[in-house]
Amino acid sequence: MLTSERSYLRYPKNRRWTEAGRFWAPHPENVLFIHKPTMEETRRVALGLRSQLVRNRERKTKAHLLSLELDRLVQVHDSRVRVINADIDAVKQMIGNMTWSDNIDMPQSRSHEPPLVTSPPQASHRNFTVAIVPGDPHFSVDRDLRGELMPTLYMNQNQWLPSFGPWFISLTDNAMQRRVFPKELKGTVNFQNSTSLKLISHTLTTVASTTADFFADARHLTDTQAALCLVNAYFCQKTSRQLPATPDDLLADLPQKLDLLITQLKQESGPGDFSFTYSNPQERASLAPLNKESRYPTAFFQRHKLHAMMAKAGLFPHNKGTGAPGTAPAMDLVFAITSAMFGSDIPPFSAYQWNLRAGIVALEVFILAYGLLEFGQVARGHPNRRLNLVSLLGPKFQPGALPDPNAPMLKRGQLFSFISEHYIIPTLQANPNAPVSFIFPGIILAALEARSTVSHKQPGPFVNLTGSRFNEIFEILNQQLTFRDPLALLQARTALRLATEEGLDVLLSHPSPPTLLQEIIKSQFGGGDDYDRAYFMVLGCLPVVLAVV
C-alpha cells in the first residue's frame, strides 16, 4: 500500500459546510432581538380577543338555555290553559243544561229595611268551648285559653295582682337584673312579687310554641299529629283494631290507647332511656338530620326505649334489623294512617325521620300528662289547693258550677278522659295544627325545670338559685323583640327544643315520673293537689290573688 493511501485511511478529509449549513452555523453576527413593547401589545390584543370570544360563547349558551326554558314555560302554560278552558267549557255546558224555574219569587229589597246579615262574624267559626276539671265551668275560647285568660287577671291592678309561684318570681327577678332584656317587658308590677302582663304572656307564648315547626314543608306533620299516628298504629297492631278512618278516630279512646302504650312500656326491661344519641356534636345545632338527609344516623334512636318498643312491634318495617321475627304487620300501619289522614305527601316515618322524632317527643308529653292524672281526684275544698277561680274570675265564675261535694270518686284515668274529651279534642278540632306544647305547656315547663336540676346530685331537697334555667327563654325573647336576627332566633328555638327533650328524658327516666312531676309542680309552681296539677298542665301557671300594698 502506498504512503498516500495509508494517510487517507487514517485521517479522513475535512468536510466543508454546505450553503444551508453555513446559514445555521453559529456566527457572532447571528443575533435574536426581541422588542418588548411589541410583544406586550401583541399579548394584550390576544387576551382581549380571547376574552371577547369567551363572552360571545357564554352569551350564546345563556341565550340557548333561556330559549329552552321559555319554550318549556310556554308548553306548561299552554297545557294549563287547555285544562282551564276545558273546565270552563264543562261548567258552561252544565249551566246551559240547567232548568230554570220562573215560578220562584225573588224577594225585592226595600230601601227602608236594613239588609239581612246571612253569614256570622268571621271570628265566630273559631270560637269553641273547653273544660279542664269536672264540675268547673266551661270556658268559651276564641283562639288561646291562656292568652284570653291572662288579661282578665289584671283588671284591678290598684287592688290586687296575680302571683304565679316561685318559678315565675325567680324568672321575673332574673329578667329585671339582666343588662340586655326587652324594655317593653319590664312592667312596674314586676317589683311587687308579681309579673307584668306582657312578661307572663310572652313567656307562656314562648313555652307554648316550643315544639312548633320552624319552617313549612309539605312532608311535615305537627308533633301532635305524628304522635297520634304512632299511638294509633301501636294500638291497632296490639289489639287488631281497624285503622282510624277519620280525624275524629285518631282522637277517639285516647286514654285507652295511652294506657296500653304505658303498660307495655313498663314491661320493657331492656337497657336504655328516653334520650337520643348524638354521635356528632354538630347534630345538636339542628333538629333536622345533617347534610340535608332524611334519616338520622343508625345510632340516633338506639337507646330510646319508646322507639325500641315500637320497632320491636314492627311499626317501622322499612328499618332493617328491627322488629321481632313474625311480629311485623303485613303493611306499614303508620304510613297507612298518614296517607289516609294527611295525603300522599307524607313519606313513611322510617324514611323521613323528622316526623318520627317529633312524634316520639310529643308522645312522651302525652305519657307524662296521663301518668300525672292517672289516679287524679278533684274533691271540693282541698286544704292544699292553690288555684281559686272564684277569687280570680269574680262574678264571671258561676256559683252553680261548683263541684258537688257528694260526687263519687273518679276512677282510674277518668280525670284525663275528661280532659281529653272536653279540652284536647275541642282544641285540636279548632286548631288541627296545634303542637303538643300548645296543648300542655305545663309539662314543657316541668321538663325544663327537671333538666336544670339534673346536674345537681344532692341527697336531699335543694333550691336552684341560678338563672341559667331561663337562658333559652330569655334568648328567644331578646331575639324576637330586641335584636331580631332570624338565624339567632332559629338557634335559640332549637336550643329550647333540645332542652325540652333532655328534660323529658330526665322525667321519664326517673323511677316514678309522676312523683317527680308532682314535686316540681308543688315546689316551683305551688300546685298542691290534682285540681292544681290539671290546670297547671293546661295553663302553664297557677295564679293567685296578691293584694297590692
UniProtKB/Swiss-Prot annotation:
Disulfide pattern: none
GO biological process: symbiont entry into host cell; viral genome packaging; viral penetration into host nucleus
Chain spans, region Interaction with major capsid protein/MCP: 1-54
InterPro entries: Herpes_UL25 (IPR002493)
Source species: Human herpesvirus 8 type P (isolate GK18) (HHV-8)
Name of the protein described by the UniProt record: Capsid vertex component 2
Gene Ontology CC: host cell; host cell nucleus; viral capsid
Subcellular location(s) of the protein: Virion; Host nucleus
Subunit structure comment from the entry: Heterodimerizes with CVC1. Interacts with major capsid protein/MCP and triplex capsid protein 1/TRX1 at the pentamer vertices. Interacts with the large tegument protein/LTP.
Keywords associated with the record: Capsid protein, Host nucleus, Host-virus interaction, Viral genome packaging, Viral penetration into host nucleus, Viral release from host cell, Virion, Virus entry into host cell
Gene name of this polypeptide: CVC2
Record's function text: Capsid vertex-specific component that plays a role during viral DNA encapsidation, assuring correct genome cleavage and presumably stabilizing capsids that contain full-length viral genomes. Participates in the interaction between the capsid and the tegument through interaction with the large tegument protein/LTP.
Family label: Belongs to the herpesviridae CVC2 protein family.
Superkingdom of source: Viruses
